[in-house]
Amino acid sequence: VRNFGFGDLIFRTPKGKELITVSNLPELINAIQTVPEGSLLYHAKSNHFSNWLAAHGYLGLASQVRPLNHADFKNSTAHRAYLVELIENTIKNRKARQVVEIQRDTFDHTKRFTQISGGSLGGKARGLAFAQKMIRLSDFRDRYDGIEINIPHAVVIGTDSFDEFMKQNNLWSDALSKKTNKQISKLFLNSNINEELKNSLKVFVKSVKYPLAVRSSSLLEDSQYQPLSGMYATYMLPNNRKKLKERLEDIIVAIKLVYASTFFQDPKSLISGSVHHIEEEKMAVIIMQMVGQNYNGRYYPPISGTAQSFNFYPVSYMKRNEGVVHLALGLGRTIANGEKSLRFSPKYPGILPQYYSIKAALESSQNSFYAMDLSPKNHPLFNGEEKNLSSYNLEIAETDGSLKWSGSIISKEDNVIRDSLSYDGTRITTFAPILKWGKFPLVDILKDLIIMGKEALGCEVEIEFAVNIFDDPNRKPEFALLQIKPMVMGGSREIINIEEESNNEIFCSSKVTLGDGLIDNVRHIVFVDP
């Protein structure tokens, strides 16, 4: 019965002397790392590890450990390391299964999603938690073995803290009556968060050294009907000041400003035109690891983007239900602000309609990108949300080494687009190494995520993502799913067919147009024949 795995696992010498008792996975890791080689071989050959794991419900791990043979490894050190890696991956995956609350004294880096305070997670954080669960419950990651696919580490401050902040500082009346965003921001910055939240944030800040994005996650944000996506504030923080007190203060200021954005004029106007009331809105806050790399004091990912399952503006033989992707070099603000980015159908990644001529390529290509300035002299919150990031030209990206994943050149010699940076000419972004040469399976990943998202949500979906590709060949490239949310679908979905026979009735036509829609306040159209 002892060898069936019930109860504790007792490590012994081959002669039966007890060495150490194990009751959970962390203790098992410690034992594997410390017991003598003879004991390790004895238990491995006798299948005691897999028996104990299976009896304690770790069936997947047991099935991985069972077929292992010591002869398959170079030495016992390699054997130990492999066993530890398998167990650590199981611990990490189990902890990633749920949103857990932060502990008072420690922050666990193996947990992808942690909550501070109670209440709702808000729309954006709820979508992030859903994305994590969707990835975990599928075999999605197994299809891309050499790529790290996950959501960024995130801490969510539930809406209970927002309620307490508003009540403790008696803010409701003033927040609703102030006329300008500047007045509202000042009101909130002069208010205090409670000590319990401050202490939890202090535990978090002590443990993380990477740049952070402090994002809104209101109740109405990213909902399928009348969403407020993009209406509230997001602040990027280098999180690299020398003093803990300063880093903590930056996060607290960013949280207050996100809270304040609940009452800014744009969201208030949008809510007033809906079935909702501003008094119903509550704000959760996500503090998320920024995805990117440090390029000479600038922090940004080589690729960021969005993917939508429905294409409102198909051209040529593209179809609406084939979706559309927008890609940009650097942080995603380029796309969020509607600036120049690369647009293509995931079904035809090699076809770029916006580059139908050299002139069009020059006019349509992204020519600048956003990054976080990591300089200690830069105060990330001093000039508000819009000045929170810095803009750079493509020559800087080439110097950084990040343009090689997205850049091409319009050759000065023959005025032809070359998928190489070794020619003289104008730099443009085509993402040819990804879309044409398959250096990273981005299109396949996005296709799979769109299918999974539509099945899970039961509607058209929009995905936000970022990609890290490293120069170090031993480091896995990363695909970070930043958000998945219902896509806003308004107006008619009816397909309008124009027959060839009706060409003589067409008074104006174009090969590059917006999709159809409805404008109900236009009564007359005046056409002037050019």
How should these model regions be labeled?
Residues 154:
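Conserved, mostly hydrophobic/aromatic
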Residues 171, 175-189:
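N-terminal leader/propeptide and maturation segments of large enzyme subunits in energy/redox metabolism
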Residues 131-136, 162-168:
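Short active-site loop/helix that positions an aromatic residue
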Residues 62-68, 130, 160-162, 236-238:
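Short hydrophobic alpha-helical segments that form membrane-spanning helices or hydrophobic packing faces
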Residues 102-143, 192-530:
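Conserved mixed alpha/beta core segments that line enzyme active sites in large multi-domain catalysts
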Residues 1-96:
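Terminal, compositionally biased segments used for targeting/anchoring and flexible tails
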